[in-house]
């Protein structure tokens, strides 16, 4: 009786074990295919994340410090401000002195603030952000629009309607995307009042970069750049610098994407820059990825 009782259990166990083995094998086959398909988007997203984090490891990844010097700012007459009677009280820390009743801007502070503004602009362009150039000076409208067009961004040099940013879903549609950065070449309108977009951008928490003259209020500008916003050489220099920063950042993004794509790896791990997929030292030097002195 013991043998008769054990035999059916063994047979039943054998019958049940065979389908379980086939099902497990089938599950492993399907799971491997699904995992391989799922790894591709994960690898692409991981590559993109590490490409975006690469500039954050360096203080001046895009080498914007070499784009200008204090001498070039002086030659472009960036240091010339307005009459002392038009001085805004919040601009006094950036004024070097006064000569013949005209305020002189401290170019050392201008160089420091301009480097921060260019670096931030390059980072926004590197991450694919929308950059909007804004001005109400009619004599520079063509220059500013040409600058934005040449670097693949946008410009607004006409009348700026109030609420265009704060009430954008109602005025422009529900699917409209606001700019990620607004660059003000002039923070005042035609009648020397603060530009409406400065106030609206502050309300919408949109970062701003602005050239502020001695008669401007720099409080609502995220990255103020003390400088002359009236002389054509100064405005041309600012446009050239921002255009170069944007185009250089976009070119660096294309180079890094091509480099990681050719190497076929998700990119360097932050804790191990020499991991497979990391750019070689020669490639890093060519891309300007080395630490700035």
Swiss-Prot record:
Q: Where is this region: Disordered?
A: 21-49, 263-293
For this record, the Gene Ontology CC terms, alphabetical, are:
mitochondrial inner membrane; mitochondrial small ribosomal subunit
Q: Which InterPro entries match?
A: Ribosomal_uS2, Ribosomal_uS2_bac/mit/plastid, Ribosomal_uS2_CS, Ribosomal_uS2_flav_dom_sf
Where is it localised?
Mitochondrion
Where is there biased composition of kind Basic and acidic residues? 39-49
Which GO terms fall under biological process for this protein?
mitochondrial ribosome assembly; mitochondrial translation
Instruction: Give the top-rank taxon of the lineage listed in the UniProt record for this protein.
Output: Eukaryota
Primary location:
mitochondrion
Any one GO molecular-function label of the UniProt entry: structural constituent of ribosome
Keywords in alphabetical order? Mitochondrion, Ribonucleoprotein, Ribosomal protein
Subunit composition and interactions? Component of the mitochondrial ribosome small subunit (28S) which comprises a 12S rRNA and about 30 distinct proteins.
Protein name according to UniProt? Small ribosomal subunit protein uS2m
Species of the source:
Bos taurus (Bovine)
């Amino acid at each position: 009786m013991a043998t008769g009782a054990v035999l059916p259990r063994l047979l039943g166990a054998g019958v049940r074990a065979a389908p379980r083995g086939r099902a497990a094998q089938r599950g492993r086959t399907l799971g491997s295919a699904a995992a391989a398909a799922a790894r591709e988007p994960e690898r692409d997203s991981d590559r993109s994340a590490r490409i975006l984090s690469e500039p954050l490891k360096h203080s001046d990844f895009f080498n914007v410090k070499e784009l200008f010097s204090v001498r070039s700012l002086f030659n472009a007459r960036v240091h010339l401000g307005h009459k002392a009677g038009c001085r805004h009280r919040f601009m006094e820390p950036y004024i070097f002195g006064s000569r013949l009743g005209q305020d002189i801007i401290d170019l050392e502070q201008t160089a420091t603030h301009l480097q921060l503004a260019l670096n931030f602009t390059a980072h926004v362009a590197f991450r694919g952000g929308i950059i909007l150039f804004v001005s109400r000076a009619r004599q520079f409208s063509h220059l500013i629009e040409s600058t934005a067009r040449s670097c693949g961004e946008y410009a607004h040099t006409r009348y700026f309607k109030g609420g265009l940013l704060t009430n954008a879903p109602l005025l422009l549609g529900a699917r409209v995307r606001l700019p990620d950065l607004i660059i003000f070449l002039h923070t005042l309108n035609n009648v020397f009042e603060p530009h409406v977009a400065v106030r609206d951008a502050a309300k919408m928490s949109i970062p701003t970069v602005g050239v502020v003259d001695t008669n401007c209020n720099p409080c609502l500008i995220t990255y103020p750049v003390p400088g002359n916003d009236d002389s054509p050489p100064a405005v041309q220099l600012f446009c050239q610098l921002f255009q170069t920063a944007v185009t250089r950042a976009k070119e660096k993004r294309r180079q890094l994407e091509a480099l990681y794509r050719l190497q076929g790896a998700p990119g360097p791990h932050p804790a191990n820059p020499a991991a497979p997929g990391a750019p070689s030292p020669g490639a890093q030097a060519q891309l300007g990825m080395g630490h700035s002195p």
